[in-house]
Curated annotation (Swiss-Prot):
The lineage of its organism: Bacteria, Pseudomonadati, Pseudomonadota, Betaproteobacteria, Burkholderiales. Lacks the C-terminal regulatory region which is replaced by HisZ. Pathway: Amino-acid biosynthesis; L-histidine biosynthesis; L-histidine from 5-phospho-alpha-D-ribose 1-diphosphate: step 1/9. Its main location: cytoplasm. Heteromultimer composed of HisG and HisZ subunits. It is found in: Cytoplasm. HAMAP family: HisG_Short. It comes from Acidovorax ebreus (strain TPSY) (Diaphorobacter sp. (strain TPSY)). It comes from the Bacteria. It catalyses: 1-(5-phospho-beta-D-ribosyl)-ATP + diphosphate = 5-phospho-alpha-D-ribose 1-diphosphate + ATP. Belongs to the ATP phosphoribosyltransferase family. Short subfamily. One of its GO terms (cellular component) is cytoplasm. It is an enzyme of class 2 (transferase). This is ATP phosphoribosyltransferase.
Length: 216
């Protein structure tokens, strides 16, 4: 009996950069998620399907068995905590960084040096809390889910902690990157129970991904 394999992906960059890895495993997604309204997409392998979820929800779907495996950014994995997940591969895709950014006219160094209590807007509260605690900087964290750049511009926050790729969005909103917290890439994550129950098919996919990941 063929075992059903469910892969959780998020739309956008991670989805697009995962396609060559799927191809290496002999799997082709048969519908374009940008054109289809479906949240479950068929593939060229009848036993493999792709479910489309929010990037931050991928670890949760995999942890609780809604998916057998998934591709998630390191940022999402840290915020999730990683419970119940086997993380065999750094796929080295969707690379970016988590950084601190402020208004161009805000003296961040001076505020930190003087021991000011900073208001920081972010959706990455665990990453931000650990980073500022390690520096001995006192912060009030404000949880936001989008349009992070607005927070300093409206006076809601002194700084933001967010993903940065090219930095163009920051520049367009008169913000500057003042500290880099960590580099981010996407990882393959696998449900630990599924790895035991569906070991052979999952191992084939993991091994195919591993062979396709660029070295160095």
């Amino acid at each position: 009996m063929t075992q059903q394999i469910t892969l959780a992906l998020s739309k956008g960059r991670i989805f697009e950069e995962t396609l060559p890895l799927l191809a290496a495993a002999g799997i082709e997604v048969l519908e374009d998620p940008e054109k289809s309204r479906k949240l479950i997409l068929p593939t060229s392998r009848p036993e493999v399907r792709v479910v489309l979820v929010r990037a931050t929800d991928v670890p949760t779907y995999v942890q609780y068995g809604g998916a057998d495996l998934g591709v998630a950014g390191k940022d999402s994995l840290i915020e999730h905590g990683g419970q119940g997940l086997f993380r065999p591969l750094d796929l080295k895709i969707a690379k970016c960084r988590v950084s601190v950014a402020v208004r161009a006219d805000f003296d961040y160094r001076e505020a930190v040096t003087q021991g000011s209590r900073l208001k920081v807007a972010t959706k990455y509260t665990s990453i931000a809390r650990d980073f500022f605690a390690s520096k001995g900087v006192h912060v009030d964290l404000i949880k936001l889910y989008g349009s992070m750049e607005l927070a300093p511009l409206t006076g809601l926050a002194d700084a933001i902690v967010d993903l940065v790729s090219t930095g163009n969005t920051l520049k367009a909103n008169n913000l500057v990157e003042v500290e880099q917290i960590m580099d981010i890439s996407s990882h393959l994550v696998v449900n630990q129970a599924a790895l035991k129950l569906k070991q052979a098919p999952l191992r084939r996919i993991i091994d195919a991904f591993a062979s396709a990941v660029p070295q160095g």
